[in-house]
Amino acid sequence: MAAKDVKFSQDARDRMLRGVDILANAVKVTLGPKGRNVLIERSFGAPRITKDGVTVAKEIQLEDKFENMGAQMLREVASKTNDLAGDGTTTATVLAQSIVREGAKAVAAGMNPMDLKRGIEIAVAAVVKDIEKRAKPVASSAEIAQVGTISSNGDAAIGKMIAQAMQKVGNEGVITVEENKSLTTEVDIVEGMKFDRGYLSPYFVTNAEKMAVEFDDAYVLLHEKKVSGLQSMLPLLEAVVQAGKPLVIIAEDVEGEALATLVVNRLRGGLKVAAVKAPGFGDRRKAMMEDIAILTGGQLISDDLGMKLENVTLKMLGRAKKVVIDKENTTIVGGAGKKADIESRVGQIKAQIEETSSDYDREKLQERLAKLAGGVAVIRVGGATEVEVKEKKDRVEDALNATRAAVQEGIVPGGGVALLRAKKAVGRINNDNADVQAGINIVLKALEAPIRQIAENAGVEGSIVVGKILENKSETFGFDAQTEEYVDMLAKGIVDPAKVVRTALQDAASVSALLVTTEAMVAELPRDAAPAMPGGGGMGGMGGMGF
């Protein structure tokens, strides 16, 4: 085991604080509408330019091991906030830096670190309560667009695009962000349930131009096993013909004779039909078939339930307003399933998402959830260069995460105002223990840090901005750094998701309180360079070779 270097008390805290400051100072320049970019070297390819706090934090590695430990703890704040809320990473870093700095000063002045920690926790709980009380539910598409605009650094086009996508696929729908090959950024929306299985025979095609099967008001038969003969299905097929509606068969497979018979009937025009293989594999296939059954209001014909094809009636079939099948995909739009059944299934899948520990399973469950809940939207980000596309994609992802958070827990006035106004709630707390009170005061000071930083990045003195806002009694009065004016933040559309503000403070306080209570630090000693290899001795002269 390698030898260790150990630092104690003030020496340890000073080193740690230096690391915290280096990382925080690099991250906090990106905060607010007038925040600057950070250029990051890549081991290969062009450097990356970004305004995303967590991206900057993840790239920082310091040479001094003790400073690096402080920086890595702060990086943990940004990562945790990013995982939970998807945005607010720079705010969390600024808050953490302020709490660690003030905490280190208090410990140096002889205060008890554990009491300070308790004070920090009491104050944070009061702020969280205050934020939850002030949060206003997001109702309209315009409000969603505002959140998206602020989180993408004032890009109204991105805000509008996210609002459009959310309106189309619903709050539960899946929205993904991809890079576009062209200059433009666009939204591509797939409504209904789409899965990656196409028609089993091109003879089913109804639209020759698009090479697709297009059925309106169709019946959907869901069969768990293979369909090899049509004898057992004849009564059902006759009933479908009499009803005059098209039929889509989704089964494990439709084999030889059965497929040939369906194709012949389709070509003769007597039966509008198309057959598709069931999506997925194994247990996941069954679950997806059940999803389709619930979406279309039909029943999955399964041996487990003692159901046979010959006993199937029209009532057991699902219904859909439109079914489109091409060579590779099937889309079911407007299923006739009951809303209550669909909601119950969505709840079931959400519970499974919470329980699973596998990322792969979680991804597949989220796909199923999106298909049931309304659809999938893809935002394709374009730009003139690869560097520009990557920078814009970072902002779109932040904006998307922020709008999701806003839908979950509502919005509060942005620009650091919500935290600044929460000072009133913290100011009301009085504790008999002076050290605990000092911990509360540390948070009181930290609540000003984000708004000060936003102002300073805009070239305005932070203290003046804080003073002016606190003088005004309106809860939504704040500083618009973009125009450098004092405005009503909600009326101007400068809002933050309550979840992002709350998570940023909780994560910052959690890690900072641990850093403040650190008394010793242990790191590996740098290994001495291995001794150089000794030089090779001169070779003796070779004797002459006699012939």
Swiss-Prot record:
SUPFAM superfamilies: GroEL apical domain-like, GroEL equatorial domain-like, GroEL-intermediate domain like
Gene3D superfamilies: GroEL, GroEL-like equatorial domain, TCP-1-like chaperonin intermediate domain
Major subcellular site: cytoplasm
Transmembrane segments: none
Catalytic activity, reaction form: ATP + H2O + a folded polypeptide = ADP + phosphate + an unfolded polypeptide
Cellular compartments per GO CC: cytoplasm
Enzyme class label: isomerase
Subunit structure: Forms a cylinder of 14 subunits composed of two heptameric rings stacked back-to-back. Interacts with the co-chaperonin GroES.
Protein name: Chaperonin GroEL 1
Organism (species): Rhodopseudomonas palustris (strain BisA53)
Upper lineage: Bacteria, Pseudomonadati, Pseudomonadota, Alphaproteobacteria, Hyphomicrobiales
Gene: groEL1
